[in-house]
Amino acid sequence: MKRPSGRAADQLRSIRITRNYTKHAEGSVLVEFGDTKVICTVSVENGVPRFLKGQGQGWLTAEYGMLPRATGERNQREASRGKQGGRTLEIQRLIGRSLRAALDMSKLGDVTLYVDCDVIQADGGTRTASITGAMVALVDALKVIKKRGGLKGGDPLKQMIAAVSVGMYQGEPVLDLDYLEDSAAETDLNVVMTSTGGFIEVQGTAEGAPFQPAELNAMLALAQQGMNEIFQLQQAALAD
């Protein structure tokens, strides 16, 4: 089996995490997984949604979108269509669920964190790149809240979160699929994990033939291996 990119089966794409990428947001990152590039920002606003009023905890919510020419052909803006598509809604809910798992909301205080992930160039794995980059932006946003005198109850950060794709490509498990691999893969899996080794989400779909338990285990093992590298890259970015 030869991957289109020439990478080994267990090799991640080149990953770069650039912090403080925009000027105004409390946390901002440009994350690059190969040719996939996503701007992730975290904005802090006082107050919480109505359903959390008086409960003594904060909230985090996420939005996701793609520039019209992030892909090979121009896509119409969802705003001009008047509604978000099902894929967009699914991905932004995934991002929100994943990042909430990083936090103890009771220590966040009466604030809402708005995570915005905007894909400026797509070559596969946009949702996993979004989660990985937004996690770093979230850490920076928490530092800003603390500097402003918040987080009196202690550090709300419980653990780091990251995500990666794995799949069965030409009968073999491969790590971090790009678009060419993703479009031809027999199975595509998106895996979200904590830095302590737990799974937050595993999204898997077979195209054509179903995948077998042994293949699932092989893909999850590959995801765990890749995730260890990604967590190291997150920590290195935060150390700069």
Curated annotation (Swiss-Prot):
Signal peptide range in chain numbering: none
Binding site for phosphate: 87, 125-127
GO biological process: rRNA catabolic process; rRNA processing; tRNA processing
Gene Ontology MF annotations: 3'-5'-RNA exonuclease activity; tRNA binding; tRNA nucleotidyltransferase activity
Catalytic activity: tRNA(n+1) + phosphate = tRNA(n) + a ribonucleoside 5'-diphosphate
Top-level taxon: Bacteria
Keywords for the protein's UniProt record, in alphabetical order: Nucleotidyltransferase, RNA-binding, rRNA processing, Transferase, tRNA processing, tRNA-binding
Record EC number: 2.7.7.56
InterPro entries, per database record: ExoRNase_PH_dom1 (IPR001247), ExoRNase_PH_dom2 (IPR015847), ExoRNase_PH_dom2_sf (IPR036345), PNPase/RNase_PH_dom_sf (IPR027408), Ribosomal_Su5_D2-typ_SF (IPR020568), RNase_PH (IPR050080), RNase_PH_bac-type (IPR002381), RNase_PH_CS (IPR018336)
Enzyme class: transferase
Recorded coiled-coil stretches: none
Matching HAMAP family: RNase_PH
Family (UniProt): Belongs to the RNase PH family.
Quaternary state and interactors: Homohexameric ring arranged as a trimer of dimers.
Function: Phosphorolytic 3'-5' exoribonuclease that plays an important role in tRNA 3'-end maturation. Removes nucleotide residues following the 3'-CCA terminus of tRNAs; can also add nucleotides to the ends of RNA molecules by using nucleoside diphosphates as substrates, but this may not be physiologically important. Probably plays a role in initiation of 16S rRNA degradation (leading to ribosome degradation) during starvation.
Protein name per Swiss-Prot or TrEMBL: Ribonuclease PH
Name of the encoding gene: rph
